[in-house]
Every structure is written in C-alpha cells, then in structure tokens.
C-alpha cells in the first residue's frame, strides 16, 4: 500500500517538475545589449529577447499614419536597428534609455513592446500648481 502512495507522489512531483522546468525553458526571455547580440547573432535569431540601450540621436523615424517607429539602439559600442509597430510611449525620445521586447529578424530587431526608462523620483504636484508648472517638473525629471 505504501508503495502505491510513494509511486503516486513521485509521478505527481515528476509531472510538476516537468511543467515548471520544461515550460521555463520555452518561455525564457533573454536580456541583451546590442554588443551582446552582435557577438552571437545566430543564437538569438527568431527568439524572444529584450534588447536594452539608448536611442541613438538622429535616428528616430516615426510614421504617424502607419504607426511605424524606426530607430537605432546603442550601448555606446554597438548599434542595432529597431522597428516597432505602434505608438511610442509619451516619454520616448532620442538619447533615452529603452528596453524593447521582440525578435531579431534579418538583422532588424522587430519590437513588440517598448519600455522607456524614466526617473525613479516622484514628486506630486503641489496644490495650486498650473499645468505649465507640472509640465516643467516632468521635463526636469527626465
């Protein structure tokens, strides 16, 4: 009788272990810089990754009608062209730190999600502040 319970527990633990670790491998998303990607391009082709760096000044092209954003992401050493379909976040700008989730396809990073790094400090508007004062505070924090 004890053998049946032990066998049942082992089967359940084995199934749980397979679901946790087997699923983890398929859903793992790597975080890379442009330099890391360029060192091992073949490994990351058509695999989901997060690419982090700075938006290179002078490279941002946004087509409002098609909602297509193109820019170059750099880590100061290497550069990678990025394509993102959709409206960029309000704080997106040249020289800004960003993380783009997506896949590399034919040398271009096809972004599906664009995250903008912003200041960690929060200062709520004080009572009586005008919208211009609030806007100035936000711009200074960036």
Swiss-Prot record:
Q: Hey, which stretches end up on the Cytoplasmic side?
A: 1-2
Superkingdom of the organism of origin = Bacteria
UniProt record, GO biological process: cytochrome complex assembly
Q: What does this protein do?
A: Heme chaperone required for the biogenesis of c-type cytochromes. Transiently binds heme delivered by CcmC and transfers the heme to apo-cytochromes in a process facilitated by CcmF and CcmH.
- NCBIfam families in the record, alphabetically? PRK13254.1-1 (NF009727)
Membrane topology, Periplasmic segments:
24-142
- UniProt topology in membrane: Single-pass type II membrane protein
The species this protein belongs to is Thermus thermophilus (strain ATCC 27634 / DSM 579 / HB8)
Q: Which GO terms describe its molecular function?
A: heme binding; metal ion binding
* Annotated heme binding sites: 118, 122
Disulfide bridge positions per record: none
Keywords carried by this UniProt record: Cell inner membrane, Cell membrane, Cytochrome c-type biogenesis, Heme, Iron, Membrane, Metal-binding, Signal-anchor, Transmembrane, Transmembrane helix
TM region positions: 3-23
Can you name this protein?
Cytochrome c-type biogenesis protein CcmE
Q: Name one GO cellular component term.
A: plasma membrane
Query: Where is this protein localized, as stated in its record?
Result: Cell inner membrane
Question: Does this UniProt record's set of keywords contain Lipoprotein?
Answer: no
Which InterPro entries is this protein grouped with?
CcmE, CcmE-like_sf, NA-bd_OB-fold
The family line of this record is: Belongs to the CcmE/CycJ family.
């Amino acid at each position: 009788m004890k053998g049946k319970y032990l066998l049942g527990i082992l089967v359940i633990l084995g199934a749980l272990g397979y679901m946790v670790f087997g699923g983890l491998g398929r859903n793992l998303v790597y975080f890379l810089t442009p330099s890391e990607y360029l060192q091992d391009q073949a490994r990351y082709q058509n695999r989901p990754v997060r690419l982090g760096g700075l938006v290179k000044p002078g490279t941002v092209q946004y087509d409002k009608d098609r909602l297509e954003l193109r820019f170059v992401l750099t880590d100061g050493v290497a550069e990678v062209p990025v394509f993102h379909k959709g409206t960029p976040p309000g704080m997106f700008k040249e020289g800004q730190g960003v993380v783009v989730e997506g896949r590399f396809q034919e040398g271009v990073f096809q972004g599906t999600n664009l995250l903008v790094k912003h200041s960690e400090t929060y200062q709520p508007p004080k009572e009586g502040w005008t919208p211009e004062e609030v806007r100035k505070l936000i711009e200074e924090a960036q």
